[in-house]
Design a protein with these regions (language model features):
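Assembly/oligomerization interface modules of large self-assembling protein complexes
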Residues: 2-88, 152
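Generic recognition of stable, solvent-exposed alpha-helical segments in well-folded globular domains
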Residues: 18, 45, 103, 107-111, ...
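Extended oligomerization regions of viral-like shell subunits
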Residues: 44, 141, 145-274, 280, ...
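Alpha-helical scaffold segments that mediate packing/assembly in large oligomeric complexes
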Residues: 70, 77-80, 85-168, 298-299, ...
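Extracytoplasmic/secreted cell-surface and envelope-processing proteins
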Residues: 100, 185-188, 286
Length: 309
C-alpha cells in the first residue's frame, strides 16, 4: 500500500522565508561630554578666543591714619578654541539600495552620529585619536589628581580620594563618569559602617550618585578602562562650540581614494555607486579661570581613578 506524502523537502520551493520588518538593534548612543559640558554659541570661524580671568586683585589693610595704600591689579588671558573636523564617507552600490527592503541610508545615519559621539568622548576625555588642533585631553591635564584603586569608599569620597582632589582646587564635583564594568564594584561598595553605599534593597532599581553628584555610565564604547575606571569633576567647566553641525550629503560623482596609498578604490559614476558623506566641526576648551582657591589656574577640576597595581 502506498504511503507517499508531500514532505517539506519536496515543497521547499513553495515555502517562503519570513522576513521580520524590523531590525533588531540597540538605540544609538550620544556623547556624554556634550551632555554634561557647557555649550557656547556656535563658532563663526575655525578659531574662537575665550577671555579668561588669569589674575585676581588683592586688598590690603592700611596701618594708621596716614598709612600708604598699596596697589593691585587684575589680568585676563585668551584661551584659544580650535575647530577640528570629524567626517566619514560610506560608499553603497545603487543596486544594493534598490534591492534592499530597508531604508539603508536611514539606518546608517544614526550609527554615524553614534560613532562621532564616541570619537568626541574618546578624544576629549582620554586623548584617543585626538586631532592635532585640539588641546590636551582631560586625563592628561588631571594627571596630578590621579588616584590609584581599588574602587572603595576611601578612594572615592575619603581624604585624598577623587572628590577630595577636585575640592582641593576649589571646585565642586557635579558628575562622575565611569565604565559600565565598574557597576559591579559599586554595587558591592560599603560605607564606613559596612552598609551598602547604593543599594537599600534587592528589588528596586539602583540610583547611582555620590555625594549628590550623579554617576553616568556611557555605552557608546568610548570609555577607555585601560586609562581610567572613573572620572570625577566639574564637567560644566568644559566648554565646547559647534563650527559646523552634522551635515549629510549624498555623493554620486567622483572617486574615493585610499587615505594611506591614495589608490582609487571606487569610481562612483563608473560603478553606479553613491556615497553618504557626513561631516561635523567642533572645538572645546577647559578655560579654568583664576579663583580665590585656585589663584594661578594651575589646579584642574577633574580627578580619576585607575586600577590598582
Amino acid at each position: 500500500m502506498a504511503t507517499s506524502i508531500i514532505a517539506r523537502t519536496g515543497a521547499e520551493a513553495l515555502i517562503r522565508d519570513q522576513l521580520v520588518n524590523t531590525i533588531q538593534q540597540d538605540v544609538p548612543k550620544s556623547s556624554i561630554v556634550m551632555q554634561l559640558a557647557t555649550r557656547l554659541a556656535n563658532m563663526t570661524s575655525n578659531q574662537t578666543k575665550i577671555p579668561v580671568l588669569s589674575m585676581l586683585p588683592l586688598a590690603y589693610w592700611v596701618n594708621g591714619d596716614t598709612g600708604m595704600k598699596q596697589t593691585s591689579k587684575q589680568e585676563w588671558k585668551n584661551v584659544t578654541m580650535t575647530a577640528a573636523e570629524l567626517a566619514v564617507i560610506i560608499p553603497i552600490p545603487e543596486a544594493v539600495l534598490a534591492d534592499s527592503s530597508f531604508d539603508i541610508m536611514g539606518e546608517v545615519q544614526p550609527r554615524v552620529r553614534e560613532a562621532m559621539a564616541a570619537k568626541i568622548d574618546g578624544a576629549i576625555l582620554f586623548g584617543n585619536d585626538k586631532p592635532t588642533e585640539w588641546t590636551t585631553d582631560i586625563l592628561t591635564q588631571a594627571t596630578a589628581n590621579k588616584v590609584t584603586g581599588p574602587i572603595d569608599y576611601a578612594k572615592i569620597l575619603g581624604d585624598g580620594g577623587m572628590f577630595a582632589k577636585v575640592e582641593e582646587g576649589g571646585f565642586g564635583v557635579d558628575g562622575v563618569v565611569g565604565s559600565l564594568s565598574t557597576k559591579a564594584q559599586l554595587r558591592g561598595l560599603l560605607d564606613k559602617n559596612g552598609r551598602p553605599l547604593f543599594r537599600s534593597d534587592m528589588q528596586g532599581a539602583t540610583n547611582y550618585a555620590l555625594d549628590g553628584a550623579p554617576l553616568y555610565f556611557p555605552e557608546n564604547g568610548a570609555f577607555d578602562v585601560s586609562k581610567a575606571l572613573m572620572i570625577a569633576g566639574n564637567f560644566k567647566k568644559i566648554v565646547y562650540s559647534i563650527r559646523q553641525d552634522v551635515t549629510v550629503k549624498i555623493l554620486d560623482q567622483g572617486v574615493i581614494q585610499d587615505p594611506s596609498t591614495k589608490e582609487i578604490m571606487y569610481n562612483l559614476a563608473q560603478q553606479d555607486m553613491v556615497a553618504l558623506r557626513v561631516i561635523m566641526r567642533m572645538g572645546w576648551a577647559l578655560p579654568n579661570p583664576s579663583t580665590r582657591l585656585n589663584t594661578d589656574g594651575s589646579k584642574v577640576p577633574f580627578s580619576y581613578i585607575v586600577a590598582g597595581e
